[in-house]
Amino acid sequence: MSALHLYNSLSRQKEPFHPITPNHVMMYVCGMTVYDFCHIGHARVMVVFDTIARHLRASGYQLTYVRNITDIDDKIIRRAAENNEPIQALTQRFINAMHEDEAALGCLPPSIEPKATEYVAEMIAMIGELIAQNHAYIADNGDVYYSVRSFDEYGKLANRRLEDLRAGERIAINEAKNDPLDFVLWKKAKTGEPSWESPWGAGRPGWHIECSVMSRHQLGDHFDIHGGGMDLKFPHHECEIAQSEPVCGGKHVNYWLHNGFINIDNEKMSKSLGNFFTVRDVLKNYAGEVIRFFMLQSHYRGPVNYSDAALEEAKRGLQRLYTALETAPTTGGAILLPYQERFVAAMDDDFNTPQAIAVLFELAKMLNKAAAAEAADIAFTLRTLAARLGLLTGDAKTLFQQKGALSAAEIEAEIARRQAAKAAKDYATADSIREKLSALGIELKDSATGTQWYYR
């Protein structure tokens, strides 16, 4: 196995990766709450952990990748009521949309995708364990709360003391709680809302307990990697630790991974600021692979600044890689080990995709200048390494075709007209056709065997 190092949010440093079971990695990632279309922040979570999953598999590990679906939540209940739509119909509609979005981004499905509503019985059982251990209590209002004072290490993931958390957080006053930071495990049923019977009366689970239960059920009391967006680090993941460690017998996750935020033109993405984009919004103007490439150009832990200019730059970069392969051999070839080793070293260094992509550009530059005898090995290496990032697997002519632009057949017809004009020595017409295509972002490359075209 490789010398993989991960940045562990819990220790706040890079650590060598050692799976609990040799050659087998167990990874849980917090998924979507399905009440709306996925936004580009969700897209980053999808792309980041899909890329991590791809690298783990390519490194020889068997991977069990679990990503949950939250299909019961206050937001879901509220949206279903607003739409006058059954909750299950609403959630299934947005689950289907989520799957379409991740497929467009080139993401492979997780190994297991549990839904919260499928594990309510297990949630009730775990809450019962926490009550029995005096980590939770039944409040006067019928809710069940977790007592943060019962867990001495609460705040260790956020690296903040309990007193500091109380002082720094804006917490709504709730007289039913023993402590303002206590969080709900079970919500007493309200009229018109879904509910399940429990020893504490009818109700439904809180958000935090859902992930503790689903990860435990699928991966056991102790697993390798838990991931999600930086916004989940506190309180969600902090609360998961507090819930899981008492019932799992100690440390339940070895490595905590968090991806950074997406900003819009250097401002935080927010519906109130009017700079909120769904994946579908962006896919209207850019291919999914362009969005994926854009996100992988930044290290997963850092912020990404989304703008049209940045997407256009990413598109041009991806086109350069595809263009290098345009006339390269599509069969044969052997891996160039020095480039593979550098690529793998970058990915083993906490999934450093910017450095890995730099290796791809070096190969593309070599390929543009390569003699025929060398081209097959370079092209094979470029395609093989790019595929580990989920890149360069599509058809460039389809990928970069502008909305409303000429189809491939129409471009070929224009090239044929140009060839006929050149044969008739009508060079003015031939030049005019080339200029027309160039204005549409289509470049022509003439050779002894004919004319190739590609998007600039």
Curated annotation (Swiss-Prot):
Its main location: cytoplasm. A motif ('HIGH' region) lies at residues 32-42. SMART domains: DALR_2 (SM00840). It is found in: Cytoplasm. Binds 1 zinc ion per subunit. InterPro entries: Cys-tRNA-ligase (IPR015803), Cys-tRNA-synt_Ia_DALR (IPR015273), Cys-tRNA/MSH_ligase (IPR024909), CysS_C (IPR056411), Rossmann-like_a/b/a_fold (IPR014729), tRNA-synt_1_cat_dom (IPR032678), tRNAsynth_Ia_anticodon-bd (IPR009080). One of its GO terms (cellular component) is cytosol. Its EC number is 6.1.1.16. A motif ('KMSKS' region) lies at residues 268-272. It holds the Pfam family DALR_2. ATP binds at residue 271. It is an enzyme of class 6 (ligase). One of its GO terms (biological process) is cysteinyl-tRNA aminoacylation. It catalyses: tRNA(Cys) + L-cysteine + ATP = L-cysteinyl-tRNA(Cys) + AMP + diphosphate. Keywords: Aminoacyl-tRNA synthetase, ATP-binding, Cytoplasm, Ligase, Metal-binding, Nucleotide-binding, Protein biosynthesis, Zinc. Its cofactor is Zn(2+). GO terms for molecular function: ATP binding; cysteine-tRNA ligase activity; zinc ion binding. Zn(2+) binds at residues 30, 211, 236, 240. Monomer. Belongs to the class-I aminoacyl-tRNA synthetase family. This is Cysteine--tRNA ligase. It comes from Dichelobacter nodosus (strain VCS1703A).
